[in-house]
Design a protein with these regions (language model features):
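A short, N-terminal "cap"/entry segment at the start of jelly-roll beta-barrel domains
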Residues: 1-29, 42, 63, 112-121
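Short acidic-glycine-tyrosine-enriched beta hairpin
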Residues: 66-82
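A cytosolic small-molecule/anion-sensing beta-strand core signal
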Residues: 56-57, 73-74, 92
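Glycine- and acidic-residue-biased ligand/ion/polar-headgroup-sensing regions
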Residues: 48-61, 65
């Protein structure tokens, strides 16, 4: 068993959202995202996996394939279908973990997770 704390060592980057791959293997990925107030993640999708989001701290605006913006906070689970486009905007410092099955981008550097559509969940 592997043990990973979800409440320690959060890194925020004033230049933009930060993605920290907590666990990556052939079966899936768990990625910790941190955004400072008003930072955004542009529209993207995960073409080959559902994307499950668990909000750990803060509040943010998430929009899915229906383009409806929803304000969500800690202890909320969001479920995006494979290929469903989604966006994120932090209303305050926002921390969430995203889970995907499979890991087609397992060799991608963490910083690339926020640079291309293929690498983004």
């Amino acid at each position: 068993m592997k043990f990973i704390s979800l409440v320690e060592n959060w890194e925020f980057d004033p230049k933009g959202p930060h993605a920290d791959p907590l666990h990556v293997d052939k079966n899936g990925r768990a990625i910790l995202f941190t955004l400072e107030t008003e930072q955004t993640i542009r529209e993207h999708n995960a073409p080959s996996s559902p994307f499950y989001v668990v909000i750990l701290a803060g509040r943010g605006v998430f929009a899915g394939g229906d383009d409806v913006e929803r304000v969500v906070g800690a202890n909320t689970l969001l479920v995006f279908e494979p290929g469903e486009k989604h966006t994120v905007r932090a209303l305050e410092n926002l921390v969430f973990i995203g889970f995907l099955h499979g890991a087609p981008g397992a060799q991608i550097k963490p910083s690339a997770l926020l640079e291309t559509d293929e690498a983004l969940p």
